[in-house]
Amino acid sequence: TRPASFELAVRIPSFAAGATVNGETAKPGEIFRIEKEWRDGETVDVALTFEAKLVPAANGMFTLQRGALYFALPLAAQSFAWEYERSGIRRKAPYCDYKIFPQEAWGYAFAGDTFHVIERPVGAYPFSREEPPVQIEADLAQIEWDALPGQPGVCAETPASLVPTALRRRALQPYGCTTLRMTVLPALPVTKV
């Protein structure tokens, strides 16, 4: 194969904390250009770094984001098949709707701004609830967060209180690796010593 001269444009995503292209620093949110004569078998190595950070959300609360992924606190849940017939179509298990109810408390707030990222090899199913390819450990405080009146298992839009009752280290995982989850949480003020 004959060499060919052309420009290669590599888009560096803005959600990256840092990037290199063939060892050269590239700026997130910009295009990194390589103009040269290319030979058969040459490769371009793009390395992106990501930072776990709290991102403001509705009602003064926050989500945990790392790169393009949003992370959620998975909740233990129990599901019930909801079989019915509508417009002459019978919905019977397993091809029916399911009602999913939490089996643990959902009232948590972020209790710090340092996070520990755990990466694993991607398995046969990348959206696995049991073995997600990445998790982020975070300090969370248990808080009072009630259910909507008359709707057990459906949390109110905002917590009843931000007074912490217990601190726990919990693993959050990508939103797509959860069934029942808390994604938007309040953050307690962080005090530095």
Residue ranges and their predicted role:
Residues 47-193:
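C-terminal beta-rich recognition modules with glycine/proline-rich loops and embedded aromatic residues
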Residues 16-37, 52-59:
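Solvent-exposed beta-strand/loop surfaces of large extracellular or lumenal domains
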Residues 13, 22-24, 65-67:
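Short strand-coil-strand connectors
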Residues 7-8, 19, 74:
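Short helix/loop capping segments that flank catalytic or ligand/cofactor-binding pockets
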Residues 40-41:
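Short, flexible surface segments
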Residues 4-13:
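Surface-exposed beta-strand/loop patches in extracellular or lumenal glycoproteins
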